[in-house]
Amino acid sequence: VTDSLDDAGVEAVTAARVLDPARVLVAVDHDTPAGTVAVAEKQRKLLDFARDQGLPFRYGQGIGYHLALEGGLKPGSVAVCCGRHAAVLGAGGVLGLSLPPKELKTALETGTVSLPEAEVCRLRLAGALDRYVTAWDLALHLAPRCRGTLAVLGGGGLDFCQRAAVCGLLAASGAVTALFTEEPLDGAETVELAAVEPMAVLPGNFERIVPASRVDGLRVNQVFIGGCAGGTLEALRQTAAIWRGRRVNPYVRVLVAPATAAVYAQALEEGLVEVFMEAGALVMNQGCSACWAQSQGRCDGGEV
């Protein structure tokens, strides 16, 4: 349960009498610290809900999905929430489902959930991505064939950061959810990773996926490295390796936000944060940060 809920959602979910408090996590991770009085009131209601029923509660410690995985959520588990990025849990082999608030209330009270009826799209990844092709490109490459399905993927040797990017973007582009498995994928379609090219999404929605060559030369106003897929330790290490000894363009706002406090601490220990700051980036607190973009990191209507 997170502060991504709107006011009506908070009222619905906090009315639940929780069946098993140990299996629930309440995480204030989106607007931290609160940017308005209304947001502060919503977060207080979540705190009261957690305290009154003895629920685990985390404030400002990072993105709830990552906190759940750090807390020992095991492959093969089912996790439900109201957040739109629940599929990121699939990077750890967890079936993450996003529910409407009233259905989440029922799940909290009964410990059960009705699984969605969806075609299963099984994909076996083979080979390796080219040097300048990323997991984000892979997700956009797969998006058209995964829309409306439960995507189950295996192979490819992707690390956690890459799997999180694939699962999160597949769900954002229309899949019901997505997850990686170590189990055999009988009848799976094979996807050759070497055939994937750099991709981009044009403003508007994920229906507008194009080869990155279509936007070559596009002027960018703001860059955000963070969120469910970009705030992992692996992503921060990759960024620091590219930036070390370089400076960002002074006319481009560059924001970096680690996914969790544990990731932030490790990034500090490895000197990654120092690299970001010396490059001229703004290092944010852990959490959803500018991916949520409600109280920090917003662009104006004409910016990219």
Give the positions of each predicted feature.
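Fe-S-dependent hydro-lyases/dehydratases of central metabolism
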Residues: 1-304
